[in-house]
Each structure stands twice: as structure tokens, then as C-alpha cells.
């Protein structure tokens, strides 16, 4: 099933798991991946809770799942680019993350979160949503084999749900990405990466 050139991640909140589409259509839902809508999969992967309507998917067994933004469970699935046969990669693959460092509060990342504070204790809600959106990926990014191929772009100045950023903000974010990529590639060593993280057993 890994022959597809586009793979998106979604959070199936009905079954409580991260799903990679189209890879998991058959395994999780018993559906033929070639018969499923690409547009629906992409829309599900961006269905941020409280802001966009979830996507519903009915399995071959008749069970309907609710699909939301895959970032709820994994916002940086760079391992989707890896080979699955255990062999060393033939070329490098890089990930670019726009996740900010964990802020003191959620307002920097989700400026409209104040509307939802009334649902419970503000500090607890802040901590829970911050950890859900950022914390898990921060821990993942700190793994040496992930960090070694990750270009980190500081996006703290742009909120997670800023849909109407100005031209100046776009230019500033572009410049940060450009500078981060240049700095990363200046020190990138493909052979060293293979030795450290992708060495294989010559007899295997």
C-alpha cells in the first residue's frame, strides 16, 4: 500500500488512533484505497476541532468513524518517508517543522482559545491543549535520529489558527524558513547520518 505519492495523517477519534491515508484504508476500514476520495482525506487531515467540520468515514463493516486533523496525535510524521524493508535509504529525506517551542500559555499558538476557556479551569485547558498540539511532537523531535534531519523554523510569532496573516508576516516567516534551511544544509553530512542512524547489518 506504500506505492502512493501522497499520504496524509488523520486522527480517528472514534477508534482512538492515528491513521495514514491511503495506507490504512484497507487495514483499518476494510476499504479499497483506490476507490476513496483524495479530497476527503486531505480535508480530514486539516479538520481542526471546533473550527472545521469533521469528516465521516464508514467502514466496510458499517461502522462510521469521525476523522479530525492528524496533528492532534502527530504533527510531524516524518517517518512516513522511511523505507520499510530495513535497508539504508538511497537518498536523504528532510522534515520542516513550524512548531513553536512550548510557550508559557496557549494564547501564542491559539489566539482564539480564550473563547473556549469557559469550558473548564483555564490553566488546565491551556496545559492540556498545549501538550496535545505541541508537547508530543517536541518529545519526538528531540530524538537524535529525528532531530538530525529536521529543519526547525521558529513560528511562534504566527498563531496556530492565524488564517489572515499579513503580507509582512508571510515575508517574515518565509525569511525564517529560508535562513533555517540554509543553516541546516550548511552542516548536513549524508555519510555521517547513515553511519549514525541507518547502519545496516552487512550479513542481513
How should each PLM-predicted stretch be described?
Residues 1-204:
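Patatin-like phospholipase
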Amino acid at each position: 500500500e506504500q506505492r502512493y505519492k501522497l499520504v496524509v495523517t488523520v486522527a480517528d477519534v472514534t477508534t482512538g488512533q492515528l491513521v495514514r491515508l491511503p495506507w490504512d484504508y484497507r487495514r483499518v476500514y476494510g476499504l479499497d484505497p483506490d476507490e476513496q476520495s483524495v479530497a476527503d482525506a486531505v480535508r480530514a487531515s486539516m479538520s481542526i476541532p471546533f473550527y472545521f467540520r469533521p469528516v465521516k468515514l464508514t467502514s466496510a463493516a458499517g461502522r462510521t468513524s469521525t476523522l479530525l486533523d492528524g496533528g492532534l496525535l502527530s504533527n510531524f510524521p516524518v517517518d512516513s518517508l522511511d523505507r520499510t524493508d530495513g535497508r539504508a535509504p538511497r537518498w536523504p529525506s528532510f522534515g520542516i517543522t513550524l512548531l513553536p517551542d512550548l510557550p508559557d500559555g496557549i494564547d501564542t499558538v491559539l489566539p482564539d482559545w480564550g473563547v473556549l476557556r469557559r469550558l473548564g479551569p483555564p490553566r488546565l485547558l491551556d496545559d492540556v491543549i498545549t501538550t496535545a498540539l505541541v508537547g508530543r511532537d517536541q518529545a519526538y523531535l528531540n530524538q537524535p535520529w529525528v532531530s538530525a534531519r529536521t529543519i526547525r523554523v521558529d513560528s511562534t510569532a504566527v498563531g496556530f489558527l492565524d488564517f489572515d496573516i499579513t503580507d509582512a508576516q508571510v515575508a517574515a516567516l518565509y525569511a525564517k524558513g529560508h535562513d533555517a534551511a540554509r543553516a541546516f544544509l550548511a552542516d548536513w553530512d549524508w555519510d555521517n547520518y547513515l553511519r549514525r542512524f541507518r547502519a545496516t547489518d552487512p550479513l542481513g
